[in-house]
From Swiss-Prot:
Function: Essential protein. Component of the coat protein complex II (COPII), that covers ER-derived vesicles involved in transport from the endoplasmic reticulum to the Golgi apparatus. COPII is composed of at least five proteins: the SEC23/24 complex, the SEC13/31 complex, and the protein SAR1. Acts in the cytoplasm to promote the transport of secretory, plasma membrane, and vacuolar proteins from the endoplasmic reticulum to the Golgi complex. Involved in maintaining the dynamic identity of organelles of the early secretory pathway.
Membrane topology of this protein: Peripheral membrane protein
One cellular-component annotation, GO: COPII vesicle coat
Disruption phenotype: Lethal in homozygotes. Non-Mendelian segregation of the mutant allele sec24a-1 due to defective male gametophytes (pollen grains) leading to a male-specific transmission defect. In the missense recessive mutant sec24A (G92 mutation), altered endoplasmic reticulum (ER) structure with an abnormal distribution of critical component at ER export sites, thus leading to the partial accumulation of Golgi membrane proteins and a soluble secretory marker in globular structures composed of a mass of convoluted ER tubules that maintain a connection with the bulk ER.
Keyword Membrane belongs to the record: yes
Protein name as it appears in the record: Protein transport protein SEC24 A
Pfam families: Gelsolin, Sec23_BS, Sec23_helical, Sec23_trunk, zf-Sec23_Sec24
Family to which the UniProt record says this protein belongs: Belongs to the SEC23/SEC24 family. SEC24 subfamily.
GO terms, biological process: endoplasmic reticulum organization; endoplasmic reticulum to Golgi vesicle-mediated transport; ER body organization; Golgi organization; intracellular protein transport; male gamete generation; negative regulation of DNA endoreduplication; pollen development
Gene transcribed to yield this protein: SEC24A
Source organism of this protein record: Arabidopsis thaliana (Mouse-ear cress)
Region of interest: Zinc finger-like: 371-396
Length: 1038
């Protein structure tokens, strides 16, 4: 097929571009180093701190007064705060509360120690005393100004290990085998999990490779960066009632946490352009403690970067192209200090909101305007010179002629007079109609070919009936009418071909039993035009479930059937949809029952379980890609099916894997119907290739996702749609970049379903900087996490799971250590974990990646098929969907359901995300867990019976595993169903199944919800607190 570069077998080497001035460091006026090229006439502006990164000199002038001897150290907890987790509990009194549920088995109480007397001092403590603390609601910790250290007080042994969680629930036992959906959307066996909320001191298993240590809590604030004074924080403390005057609170004056302590006097004039977690020591303990409630959490979801929206308004939207940092390093040495991924995530066909559609451009007889040297498409960043007769390429600086039909005069500023009528010169994203020279054959029609397993498991589970009904219901909505073509092959131990010629009234079935030498009968009548043979196709789909309802064949000749489908499709290409119910057992591609062998895990051969066993599958994928055949795999078996091998077909053809373990039409039917219908009816780009170009001195060195790499930088995508994203890493080819900006252009050449050959073009620009701090400030957590997840999954295919998880942790440690070194000279960092505002969620997302299904635990935590299916899915997800899967939504809905319903439901009140921790759950509440692939309704044990009865009907008191969630005839149930519908419609690419679970129903509660509370410790993996402590310890190591 054609490529973008007609007449040019490979792109030429990118020539030298005009020199540009290097970007100055933030806060220093840029020095002129020559005129820049491109439409941007100014160089990179110094970074202006946003509201989230305020900077302001300290208000105090001069050194602070020397504190009197005998006062407390800054790290000591205030005697007023005696109920902070990990500190000494108060002696028993009338105000003591029972420990929370999910506590230690047997209900062992906390070990209690006497409180020390308040040290003698003439100065009052800073800040008013907190109110009494209720169980589960901790008061913010407090600290004092820096004072002379006092002799440590012997505190005795630390408190006994405890766990905490929800009222009234016990630690759930390990499960055996339950076929519930795993994340994402896969059903998973219940692992042995011992819940323990990390906010409470306890003996916790550490991250693999690190010793288990006692983690205690201390009053340590989440240190915010300084900034201009804002509204004073609302305090929950009562007025101070002591008999002495209260000192002014410096932290309140600067809108900081009350625990804030000023740096030494010699740096009073400096600002802290970073965030930090302040880690202090508990007296009598060698471990630091943390206030887990102040940890950063992405409760607002993914926030797309817009730091350069004003400077570069013509950049394409970040939904199409997201760089890991919007500041490109100017040298290899600077790039080597950036330990985070340097690259981008591209989603070329991302869905656009109404009113923001990509403009369609037809250059007509003029031909597409491209650079003669680097083949860049004309875009908003090219410049016109010589009175409009020449234009300069923004990527290679080549001076090109302007065709006569495209000529326009320039105004006094050098701007074309017809600029407003040229979307390609004002929009960062455009779609261009390609002329015939971009085709090596006529555009292919949309082709849908179905390869369906009809063995006994397919018929008994109801899969065959659901698939046939769904295909028939979508025939009128298949893209490309009236050019669309369709065909079918079914198989068990033999192959069944179907002649659907339009002249027939009923389809003719032809059976081929020779699996070694495949013979395709009537090849011209197996793939037919849908509009011409619609009657025959309808008759076939109506009769398909009945044809095999009494089939007891258990064999699967999948390999021969795949070869037969390839032989039918290789003339035109198209989309091949495979429905597989069992392990391939006959003919080519026959697979063994590998399963999960516990003896292999932890050895050098462990990764072999997660890659294709037979090279047949990768070779077939390569052949299909060559002939423009994209493959989507639907797998259904509750037994081992070897998704690692089957998924290879989707991986290298730009497709995706759908996994329904233990499929039963009564349970999973709706999910299959919606996802298959979405696959069939969404707009698809056929026979596509994608290339991303960038300026001189840099190149994209590696690509990650579902595709076949045709050359060093050309991605072959037989079928691509809006639900596919691709990640890539960037490297510097030159020691020093001389340009002031770097340009990126993504070009997707494809055939639209209507038969037009089109080119989707996205162009963006980023400044080149000399300051590592600026790279951190302009970092995009979403893009970094997307690359990290793909790299970790790929590493798990060549190394142990422990190695893949440790690699994530080490990358984050190196990045935080390098960032700490930037500020270690100017600021006394002490025991603070320092990080930029832009990366405040990176540690939590890193933890979530290590707990995701592809990397989770070992063989007892998830099945091999579930692990591999999740990996194939995550490799193709766009940024927003991946972040939601890693840190799902948790909402409380019972209070909202009790409110009177308005004419139009306002979901803002209910869609307030909660931290993913057991502490967020109240036994009196009703919660919804949503990761984009499933919905879990968690009914607290003490939830009002009226609410449960309204939502569940007469079965409200029964075992919820046997209750079907459906709408009841009352307003509360209808209101909840509207909310569920809204959550499903927010992302139509997958259809989340809805599961009901009641508090204490084990092991379902542990599997469906508790094990997915990322911030809690589970099954040997770290909780959020322990993870932060591990990062901090390693960052401080030399």
């Amino acid at each position: 097929m054609g490529t973008e570069n007609q007449g040019y077998p490979n792109f030429p080497a990118r020539p030298a571009s005009s020199p540009f001035a290097s970007a100055p460091p933030p806060g220093i006026p840029p020095q002129s180093g020559g005129p820049p090229t491109g439409s941007e006439a100014v160089g990179f502006r110094p970074f202006t701190p946003s509201a989230s990164q305020p900077t302001r000199p300290f208000t105090a002038s001069g050194p602070p007064p020397a504190p009197p001897v005998g006062t407390m150290r800054p790290g000591q907890p205030s005697p007023f705060v005696s109920q902070i987790p990990g500190s000494r509990p108060p002696p028993p009194s009338s105000n003591s509360f029972p420990s929370p549920a999910y506590g230690p088995p047997g209900g062992a109480p906390f070990q209690r120690f006497p409180s020390p007397p308040f040290p003698t001092t003439q100065n009052p403590p800073q800040g008013p005393p907190p109110p009494q603390t209720l169980a589960g609601h901790l008061s913010p910790p407090m600290s004092l100004r820096p004072q002379q250290p006092m002799a440590p007080v012997a505190m005795g042994p630390p408190p006994q290990s405890t766990t905490s969680g929800l009222p009234g629930a016990n630690a759930y036992p390990p499960a055996t085998d339950y076929h519930m959906p795993a994340r994402p959307g896969f059903q998973q066996s219940m692992p042995p999990v011992t819940p323990s909320y990390p906010g409470v001191g306890g003996s916790q298993p550490s991250f693999p490779g690190y010793p288990s240590k006692q983690v205690l809590q201390a009053p340590t604030p989440f240190q915010t960066s300084q900034g201009p004074p804002g509204p004073p924080p609302v305090s929950s403390y009562p007025p101070h009632t002591g008999g002495f005057a209260q000192r002014p609170n410096m932290a309140a004056q600067q809108n900081l946490h009350p625990n804030y302590a000023p740096p030494p006097s010699n740096v009073q004039g400096l600002t802290e352009d970073f965030n930090s977690l302040s880690l202090s020591s508990i007296p009598g303990s060698l471990e630091p403690g943390l206030d887990h409630k102040s940890f950063p959490r992405p409760l607002d979801g993914d926030v797309e970067p817009n730091s350069f929206a004003e400077m570069y308004p013509m950049n394409c939207h970040s939904r199409y192209l997201r760089l890991t940092t919007s500041a490109i390093p100017n040298s290899q040495s600077l790039a080597s200090r950036w330990h985070l991924p340097l690259g981008a995530v591209v989603c070329p066909l991302a869905e656009t909101p109404e009113g923001e559609e990509v403009p369609l451009i037809d250059f007509g007889s003029t031909g597409i305007i491209r650079c003669r040297r680097c083949r860049t498409y004309v875009n908003p960043f090219v410049t016109f010179t010589d009175s409009g007769r020449k234009w300069r390429c923004n990527i290679c600086s080549m001076l090109n002629d302007v065709p006569g039909e495209y000529f326009s005069h320039l105004d006094a500023t050098g701007r074309r007079m017809d600029m407003d009528q040229r979307p390609e010169l004002t929009k960062g994203s455009v779609e261009i109609i390609a002329p015939t020279e971009y085709m090596v054959r006529p555009p292919m029609p949309p082709i849908y070919f179905f390869l369906i397993d009809v063995s006994i498991s397919a018929t008994k589970s109801g899969m065959l009936e659901v698939v046939a009904q769904t295909i028939k219901s979508c025939l009128d909505n298949l893209p490309g009418y009236p050019r669309t073509q369709i065909g079918f092959i079914t198989y068990d131990s033999t192959l069944h071909f179907y002649n659907m010629k339009s002249s027939l009234s009923q389809p003719q079935m032809m059976v081929v039993s020779d699996l070694d030498d495949i013979f395709v009968p009537l090849p011209d009548d197996l793939l037919v035009n849908l509009s011409e043979s619609r009657t025959v196709v309808d008759a076939f789909l109506d009769s398909l479930p009945l044809m095999f309802q009494d089939n007891f064949n258990v064999e699967s000749a999948f390999g021969p059937a795949l070869r037969a489908a390839f032989m039918v499709m290789n003339q035109l290409g198209g989309k091949l949809l495979i429905f597989q119910n069992s392990l391939p057992s006959l003919g080519a591609g026959r697979l063994k029952l590998r399963g999960d062998d516990p003896r292999v895990y932890g050895t050098d051969k462990e990764y072999a379980l997660r890659v294709a066993e037979d090279p047949f599958y990768k070779q077939m994928a390569a052949d299909c890609t060559k002939f423009q055949i994209g493959i989507n795999v639907y797998a259904f078996s509750d037994k081992y099916t070897d998704i690692a091998s089957l998924g290879t077909l989707a991986k290298y053809t730009g497709g995706q894997v759908y996994y329904y373990p233990g499929f039963q039409s009564s349970v999973h039917g709706d999910k299959l119907r919606h996802e298959l219908a979405r696959d069939l009816t969404r707009e698809t780009a056929w026979e596509a290739v994608m290339r991303i170009r960038c300026g001189k001195g840099i190149r994209f060195s590696s690509y990650h996702g579902n595709f076949m790499l045709r050359s060093t930088d050309l991605l072959a995508l037989p079928a691509v749609d809006c639900d596919k994203a691709y990640a890539m890493q960037l490297s510097l080819e030159e020691t020093l970049l001389t340009s002031q900006t770097v340009y990126f252009q993504v070009a997707l050449l494809y055939t639209a379903s209507c038969g037009e050959r089109r080119i989707r073009v996205h162009t963006s620009v980023a400044p080149v900087v000399t300051d590592l701090g600026e790279m951190y400030r302009q970092a995009d957590t979403g893009s970094i996490v997307s690359l990290y997840a793909r790299l970790a999954i790929e590493k798990s295919l060549s190394a142990k799971l422990d190695d893949a998880r440790n690699a994530i942790q080490q990358k984050i440690v190196k990045a935080l250590k390098e960032y700490r070194n930037l500020h270690a000279v100017q600021h006394r960092l002490g025991s603070r974990l320092v990080y930029p505002e832009s990366l405040k969620f990176l540690p939590l997302y890193g933890l979530a990646i290590t707990k995701s299904t592809p990397l989770l635990g070992g063989p007892a935590d998830t099945s091999l098929d579930e692990r591999c299916a999740a990996g194939f899915t995550m490799m193709a997800l766009p940024v927003k969907k991946l972040l939601k899967l890693l840190y799902p939504n948790l909402f409380r809905v019972d209070e909202w359901l009790l409110k009177p319903s308005a004419a139009h439901d306002d979901f803002k009140d209910v869609l307030r995300r909660l931290p993913l921790a057991a502490e967020s759950l109240d036994s009196r509440g009703l919660y919804i867990y949503d990761d984009g692939f499933r919905l879990v309704l968690w009914f607290g044990r003490m939830l009002s019976p009226d609410i449960a009865k309204n939502l569940l009907g007469v079965d409200f008191a029964a075992d919820l595993s046997r209750v079907t969630f459906q709408e009841q005839e009352n307003g509360m149930s209808k209101k909840l169903m509207r909310l569920v519908k809204k959550l499903r419609e927010s992302d139509p690419s997958y259809h989340p199944m809805c599961f009901l679970v009641r508090q204490g129903e084990q092991p379902r509660e542990g599997f469906l919800l508790l094990r997915n509370l990322i911030e809690d410790q589970m099954g040997g993996s770290s909780g959020y607190v322990d993870w932060i402590l591990q990062l901090h310890r390693q960052v401080q190591q030399n």
